[in-house]
């Protein structure tokens, strides 16, 4: 099988570094480009760091992006022109940016996920099923913990779980979005979905969804111990996307969760 030419955008970040390591150990990929938003005179794995340009991505089959929203949109403009596939692991998009991603997906295959872990995506699926099975008596909230360097909150994964709750009720997450707390020891339930984000230490990721009727509490949770589970998932997504038609895909499509 011919190796897939891979570009990693956001290569100096935590996920970027892990992706470089994982891709070097994966026989399906050949690392062809490493980029950052600003020019940096440096080589990693024998590859000179570059900025996001058409020339940089010319020989690439698929781009894995772990950057920031405005950078992701710049990458999508280039990828759309070159007809390159993009795996988006970036989080923190607003509604307007989400709409632009959907627009780009009409011309190129895009897989977007706030979390590339099999376990987290299974948790999201179970969250939706649970939400669908419970009546309005049950209130829900989402709790997440990440390392102190993570800036956005709630995390992309927490929002995925919130979407799972909303989807279970056949409602839009933005209409069910409750309060967003940061570094609170405890936080309340509400008629809408409340989120609490903790930022401390070097924690890779912990997520918990809770449903409460006042008579009982149902908890669904996931804890990550190794960042490689995310990079391995991103590479699996990149390989899967190679033979796909233009469209906006998720890990749920890849894992065939219905």
Swiss-Prot record:
Keywords: Amino-acid biosynthesis, Cytoplasm, Diaminopimelate biosynthesis, Lysine biosynthesis, NAD, NADP, Oxidoreductase. The keyword NADP applies. It comes from the Bacteria. The keyword Cytoplasm applies. InterPro entries: DapB_C, DapB_N, DHDPR_bac, NAD(P)-bd_dom_sf. Catalyzes the conversion of 4-hydroxy-tetrahydrodipicolinate (HTPA) to tetrahydrodipicolinate. Belongs to the DapB family. HAMAP family: DapB. PANTHER family: 4-HYDROXY-TETRAHYDRODIPICOLINATE REDUCTASE 1, CHLOROPLASTIC-RELATED, DIHYDRODIPICOLINATE REDUCTASE. This is 4-hydroxy-tetrahydrodipicolinate reductase. It comes from Pelagibacter ubique (strain HTCC1062).
């Amino acid at each position: 099988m011919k190796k897939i030419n891979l570009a990693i955008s956001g290569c100096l970040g935590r996920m970027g570094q892990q992706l470089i390591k994982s891709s070097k150990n994966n026989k399906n990929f050949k690392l062809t480009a490493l980029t950052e938003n600003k020019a940096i005179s440096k080589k990693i794995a024998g590859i000179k760091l570059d900025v996001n340009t058409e020339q940089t991505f010319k020989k690439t089959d698929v781009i894995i992006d772990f950057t920031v929203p405005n950078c992701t949109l710049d990458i999508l403009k280039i990828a759309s022109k070159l007809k390159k596939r993009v795996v988006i692991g970036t989080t923190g998009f607003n509604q307007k940016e989400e709409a632009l991603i959907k627009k780009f997906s009409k011309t190129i295959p895009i897989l977007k996920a706030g979390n590339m872990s099999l376990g987290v995506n299974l948790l999201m699926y179970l969250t939706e099923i649970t939400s669908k099975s419970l009546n309005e008596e049950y209130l829900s909230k989402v709790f997440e913990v990440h390392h102190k360097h993570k800036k956005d909150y709630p995390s992309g994964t927490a929002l995925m779980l919130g979407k799972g709750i909303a989807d279970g009720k056949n409602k839009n997450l933005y209409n069910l979005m409750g309060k967003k707390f940061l570094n609170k020891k405890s936080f309340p339930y509400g008629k809408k979905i409340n989120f609490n984000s903790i930022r401390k230490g070097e924690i890779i990721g912990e997520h918990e969804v809770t449903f409460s009727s006042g008579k009982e509490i149902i908890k669904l949770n996931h804890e990550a111990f190794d960042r490689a589970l995310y990079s391995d998932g991103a590479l699996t997504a990149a390989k899967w996307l190679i033979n796909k038609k233009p469209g906006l895909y998720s890990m749920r499509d890849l894992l065939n969760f219905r």
